[in-house]
């Protein structure tokens, strides 16, 4: 009986699907009351934990991202639910689930959180009821044609946190270089990607395409969804997923110095340059670069494992020219093919 109380699957479900993580059976069957019983039980237990600590549980993040297409297509129980509730398709089934769970949370004085999928492509009637129940929705998949997602969410009434993969996914590799570990499905994310994010002009937050080619930011918003409710852009958030993490040194390497730009955009959502005047961007970037360079000295003193970018080099008129990313950096070299050390000759 207890097992039936929390049953979350359809024994006769023949749906065939594959999730982004290559699973074939990782979706709850929301036609079963056991799903709701389980979710409500988890919320109750969380409330008890918070209460034991002398706190009130204010927000529960529901997740809700990347539900694979086809996950309910061949479930007799879902078909029966759709007929009983007058639901037309799987998207309306998900709306039914989100509406019920957020209503339950609201009755307990708890706000919901979720990834962008929970707030996309719903009718105004749904948004009018459900959006006020959310404390935050994270906009994450913002590459290319999906760059308008943060503004679609905000305009629909959802409190939106910019969690853009193109700017704030810390586990993306710094560059394409073989020595830079990390993922690259959403592009590359270095210490400048978070810094040049523009929460209130989000289309200019992507200054380079996947191949590193500079984009025309002055034209990036043409024909795209405008931000009509800026009050619903409530913050920025960095993500560090653990698929590629092997030790804490790697955590530090991914985060430092990327998080300086994230922190700056959290405090100052409107960058200090004018994209119509390229010289102001260059000056602002140089100023940021100098500040980061100073902080690296502090990180080094404290023993953190941070990344220093590769030096640049080119041969011009038979002479090797070398530069560095941050002011004051020294480049050590050898002439015998051995690995340079701190005691090797310094390039001047």
State what each model feature region is.
Residues 1, 31, 63-65, 113-117, ...:
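Generic beta-strand/beta-sheet core signal
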Residues 120-133, 138-272, 276-289:
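Conserved alpha/beta catalytic core and glycan-binding cleft of carbohydrate-active enzymes
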Residues 29-33, 37, 88, 92-96, ...:
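Soluble non-cytosolic domains of exported or imported proteins
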Residues 106, 111, 152, 180, ...:
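Domain-scale activation on soluble regions of proteins
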Residues 275-348:
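Short, compositionally stereotyped local motifs that mark structural "simplifiers"
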Residues 112, 160, 331:
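Hydrophobic anchor at the start of a short beta-strand
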Residues 37-48, 53-132, 136:
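Gly/Pro-rich turn-and-neighbor structural signature
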Residues 2-33, 70-92:
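Aromatic- and acidic-residue-enriched carbohydrate-binding clefts of CAZyme catalytic domains
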């Amino acid at each position: 009986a207890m097992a039936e109380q929390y049953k979350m699957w359809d024994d006769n479900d023949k749906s065939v699907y594959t999730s982004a993580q290559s699973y074939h059976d990782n979706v709850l069957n929301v036609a079963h009351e056991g799903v709701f019983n389980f979710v409500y039980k988890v919320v109750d237990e969380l409330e008890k934990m918070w209460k034991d600590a002398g706190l009130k549980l204010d927000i529960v993040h529901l997740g809700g991202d990347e539900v694979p297409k086809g996950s309910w297509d061949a479930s007799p129980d879902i078909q029966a639910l759709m007929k009983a509730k007058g639901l037309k398709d799987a998207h309306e089934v998900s709306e039914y689930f989100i509406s019920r769970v957020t209503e339950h949370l609201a009755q307990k004085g708890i706000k919901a959180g979720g990834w962008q999928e929970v707030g996309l492509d719903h009718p105004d009637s749904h948004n009018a009821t459900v959006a006020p129940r959310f404390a935050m929705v994270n906009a994450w998949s913002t590459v290319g044609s999906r760059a308008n997602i943060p503004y679609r969410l905000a305009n629909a009434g959802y409190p939106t946190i910019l969690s853009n993969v193109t700017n704030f996914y810390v586990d993306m590799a710094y560059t394409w270089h073989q020595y830079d570990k990390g993922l690259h499905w959403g592009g590359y994310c270095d210490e400048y990607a978070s810094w040049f994010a523009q929460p209130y002009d989000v289309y200019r937050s992507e200054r380079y395409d996947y191949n590193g080619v500079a984009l025309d930011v002055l034209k990036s918003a043409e024909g795209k969804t405008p931000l009509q409710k800026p009050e619903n852009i409530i913050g920025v958030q960095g993500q560090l997923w653990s698929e590629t993490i092997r030790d804490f040194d790697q955590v530090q390497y991914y985060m430092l110095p990327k998080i300086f730009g994230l922190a700056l955009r959290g405090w100052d959502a409107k960058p200090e340059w004018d994209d119509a005047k390229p010289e102001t961007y260059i000056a602002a970037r140089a100023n940021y670069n100098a500040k980061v360079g100073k902080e690296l000295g502090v990180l080094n003193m404290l023993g953190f494992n941070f990344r220093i970018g590769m030096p640049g080099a080119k041969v011009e008129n038979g002479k090797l020219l070398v530069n560095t990313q941050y002011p004051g950096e020294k480049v050590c070299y050898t002439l015998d093919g051995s690995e340079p050390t701190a005691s090797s000759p310094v390039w001047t």
